[in-house]
UniProtKB/Swiss-Prot annotation:
GO cellular component term of the entry, any: endoplasmic reticulum membrane
Region (Disordered): 105-130, 152-172
Gene Ontology biological process terms in this record: protein localization to plasma membrane; regulation of adenylate cyclase-activating G protein-coupled receptor signaling pathway
Pfam family, one: MRAP
Protein's name according to its UniProt entry: Melanocortin-2 receptor accessory protein
Topology in the lipid bilayer: Single-pass membrane protein
Superkingdom of this protein's organism: Eukaryota
Coiled-coil portions: none
Length: 172
């Protein structure tokens, strides 16, 4: 062999590997720190670092301060977070679409009981006069029930599909 190595012996043979290690004999009785305390300190510091990263990520995922969240301005959201912020968007838009309580009571007293001015007028009067303003913050399921049952946020329910929709024709 030209280079003096044995081709049958792998490179990671025991003798070859020990040539590159500097094994220093350590007497554990002479150590100032206990041998397990170093390992415990390592894992505790690693866990603290992971918790710190989690808290930083959690802080960064919040959409601004509470003052920013309660402001009447419209906030731009990322396109991938629309599904996640749907509940918050509905709560933000709810005060915009609701009438003041005094206005709805005044309209309810001025409108005759048998007359209807629109398909959603009685629903709007009932929901705005019987539910207080902060009820949706404490009971968010009421918002979904009102929306699904044709509450004040639903202006009109189409009885037939839009002109370009062919899904009803395909089912027939």
């Amino acid at each position: 062999m030209a280079n003096g190595t044995n081709a049958s012996a792998p490179y990671y043979s025991y003798e070859y590997y020990l040539d590159y290690l500097d094994l220093i004999p350590v007497d554990e009785k002479k150590l100032k720190a206990h041998k397990h305390s170093i390992v415990i300190a390592f894992w505790v510091s690693l866990a603290a670092f992971v918790v710190l990263l989690f808290l930083i990520l959690l802080y960064m995922s919040w959409s601004g301060s509470p003052q920013m969240r309660n402001s009447p301005k419209h906030h731009q959201t990322c396109p991938w977070s629309h599904g996640l912020n749907l509940h918050l968007c509905i709560q933000k838009c709810l005060p915009c679409h609701r009438e003041p309580l005094a206005t709805s009571q005044a309209q309810a007293s001025s409108v005759e009981p048998g007359s209807r001015t629109g398909p959603d007028q009685p629903l709007r009067q009932e929901s705005s006069s019987t539910l207080p303003l902060g009820v949706f913050q404490t009971h968010p399921t009421l918002l979904w029930e009102l929306t699904l049952n044709g509450g004040p946020l639903v202006r009109s329910k189409p009885s037939e599909p839009p002109p370009g929709d062919r899904t009803s024709q395909l089912q027939s």
